[in-house]
């Protein structure tokens, strides 16, 4: 069994002050404060018959009483043939008598006609200033600087003398240039250039070095400062998932907490539990009680009261809402399984008395929607990630250009139609409508495209998902057709066409009633 902790009692003086008026003071407290203990009585009554005044007890004089002090470790000592000498400390005699009387000078009366100004020379006050104090001042001469020889020019002519004074030399000025660069994570440096003197990098900082060697200023490095590593722009932090929430609106008031604690909708002994599967229970629950029209401007977020005539009886759209006279506002909560529950408390008017009072049970209509789970962390992918290697392409070295005037039309000149110069291919190759396919493996996939005979120009596109595509914009100019006249030849050549080809005029084509081609 553990012993009880001992509580320290209050001081005797404080206990006596508080309990004296009530008369409940303990006897030991009263005896100690009023000095009526056994020891106090012995000293009080014993001092009347015994006198200890000559011993010096409690006098504070330090004389040791009538016998004096005895050194430690020695006896009192006995001297043969004489009286022992008592060793006493020396005391300063205190003179007892009247205090010395100091004479006070009498002050002569001041005449009314005398001046109130007292000259300083007539002041009889004591000199409060100290006497003469010897002051020693040490004078240090200023060191002489370097002498500058200035040439002096003297003339003996009658004109004014001109003295040429050389300017003082200006001391060299020390200049210190500092540069500070701040890291901007939203700006990324991408350097691509031709190989030249220096080095380039794709990191956050660019260091360009040239020349041979350098010079260190400040001597050897004696102190090393520990640097803090800043996170790179490719690193990111993954936040921990938030704890599971109990409701979508966690704000709770005191009134709602008291109401929930006093009355529970899930009490099956007092409230009937009805699960509703109709989606109208969330938006327009009144349509489940009676037939009504739609009002898009009205939101049923309040308590609905339904009045019904006694003589008339209407079947509700939903049998679960039979005889409902009042349907409360929606309440949101969570179930033990973690689902969101929308609840409405309804009151039935099953029995009606002659006085007009309706009696009915209370019904709890509810519907479970979904659960509120914790957010799973989403792993983000890096956009624009590269290996750090730069590709440098020098166009003038790897390409060949031919100086050719494309705007010049070779057919615009007067050239003989039978000349062999027309057979030369002097046109510029145009690959604007072509497609470049580069495969990444040796075995390529072959596609068989059926070919149909038709007069129309057909275009086929084959999609290869294993390669790379290079697409260029395509632009075509529509040229107006010039119809021939009797003065024009059968073959019409347009000088605006740079391709150098020709086509047959539509009027010279064969006319057939049935179409052979699609």
UniProtKB/Swiss-Prot annotation:
Cysteines paired by S-S bonds: 19-25
Compartments (UniProt record): Virion; Host nucleus; Host early endosome; Host Golgi apparatus
Description of post-translational modifications: Highly phosphorylated.
Keyword DNA-binding: yes
GO CC term, one of those recorded: host cell nucleus
Keywords annotated in UniProt: Capsid protein, Cytoplasmic inwards viral transport, Disulfide bond, DNA-binding, Host endosome, Host Golgi apparatus, Host nucleus, Host-virus interaction, Late protein, Microtubular inwards viral transport, Phosphoprotein, Viral penetration into host nucleus, Virion, Virus entry into host cell
Domain of life: Viruses
MF-aspect GO terms: DNA binding; structural molecule activity
Placement of sequence motif Nuclear localization signal: 1-10, 510-517
One annotated GO biological process: viral penetration into host nucleus
Family, as annotated: Belongs to the papillomaviridae L2 protein family.
Subunit structure: Interacts with major capsid protein L1. Interacts with E2; this interaction inhibits E2 transcriptional activity but not the DNA replication function E2. Interacts with host GADD45GIP1. Interacts with host HSPA8; this interaction is required for L2 nuclear translocation. Interacts with host importins KPNB2 and KPNB3. Forms a complex with importin alpha2-beta1 heterodimers via interaction with the importin alpha2 adapter. Interacts with host DYNLT1; this interaction is essential for virus intracellular transport during entry.
Record's function text: Minor protein of the capsid that localizes along the inner surface of the virion, within the central cavities beneath the L1 pentamers. Plays a role in capsid stabilization through interaction with the major capsid protein L1. Once the virion enters the host cell, L2 escorts the genomic DNA into the nucleus by promoting escape from the endosomal compartments and traffic through the host Golgi network.
Name by which UniProt lists this protein: Minor capsid protein L2
Source organism per UniProt: Human papillomavirus 47
């Amino acid at each position: 069994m553990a012993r009880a902790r001992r509580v320290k009692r209050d001081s005797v003086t404080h206990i006596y002050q508080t309990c004296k008026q009530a008369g409940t003071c303990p006897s030991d407290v009263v005896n100690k404060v009023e000095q009526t203990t056994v020891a106090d009585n012995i000293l009080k009554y014993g001092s009347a018959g015994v006198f200890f005044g000559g011993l010096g007890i409690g006098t504070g004089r330090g004389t040791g009483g009538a016998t004096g002090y005895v050194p430690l470790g020695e006896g009192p000592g006995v001297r043969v043939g004489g009286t022992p000498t008592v060793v006493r400390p020396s005391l300063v005699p205190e003179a007892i008598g009247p205090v010395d009387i100091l004479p006070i000078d009498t002050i002569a009366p001041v005449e009314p006609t005398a001046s109130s100004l007292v000259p300083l020379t007539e002041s009889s006050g004591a000199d409060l200033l100290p006497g003469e104090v010897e002051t020693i001042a040490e004078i240090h001469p200023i060191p002489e600087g370097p002498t500058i020889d200035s040439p002096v020019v003297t003339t003996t002519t009658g004109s004014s003398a001109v003295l040429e004074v050389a300017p003082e030399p200006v001391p060299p000025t020390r200049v210190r240039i500092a540069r500070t660069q701040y890291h901007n994570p939203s700006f990324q440096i991408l350097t691509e250039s031709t190989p030249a003197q220096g080095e380039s990098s794709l990191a956050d900082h660019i260091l360009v070095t040239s020349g041979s060697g350098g010079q260190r200023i400040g001597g050897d490095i004696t102190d090393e400062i520990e640097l803090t590593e800043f996170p790179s722009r490719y690193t990111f932090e993954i936040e921990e998932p938030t704890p599971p929430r109990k409701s979508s609106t966690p704000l709770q008031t005191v009134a709602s907490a008291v109401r929930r604690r006093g009355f529970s909708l899930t009490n099956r002994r007092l409230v009937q539990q009805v699960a509703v599967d109709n989606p109208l229970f969330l938006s327009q629950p009144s349509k489940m009680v009676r037939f009504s029209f739609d009002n898009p401007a009205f939101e049923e977020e309040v308590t609905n009261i339904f009045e019904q005539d006694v003589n008339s009886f209407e079947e509700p759209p939903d049998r679960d809402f039979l005889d409902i006279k009042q349907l409360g506002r929606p309440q949101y909560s969570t179930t033990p399984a973690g689902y969101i529950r929308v609840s409405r408390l309804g009151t039935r008017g099953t029995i009606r008395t002659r006085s007009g009072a309706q009696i009915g049970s209370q019904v709890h209509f509810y519907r479970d929607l979904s659960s509120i789970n914790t957010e799973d962390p989403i792993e983000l992918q890096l956009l624009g990630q590269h290996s750090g290697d730069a590709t440098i392409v020098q166009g003038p070295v790897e390409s060949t250009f031919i100086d050719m005037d494309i705007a010049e039309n070779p057919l615009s000149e007067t050239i003989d139609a039978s000349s062999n110069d027309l057979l030369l291919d002097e046109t510029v190759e145009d690959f604007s409508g072509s497609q470049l396919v580069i495969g990444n493996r040796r075995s390529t996939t072959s596609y068989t495209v059926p070919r149909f005979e038709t007069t129309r120009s057909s275009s086929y596109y084959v999609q290869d998902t294993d390669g790379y595509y290079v697409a260029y914009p395509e632009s075509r100019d529509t040229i107006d057709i010039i119809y021939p006249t009797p003065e024009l030849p059968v073959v019409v050549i347009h000088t605006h066409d740079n391709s150098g080809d020709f086509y047959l005029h539509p009027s010279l084509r064969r006319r057939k009633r049935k179409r052979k081609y699609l």
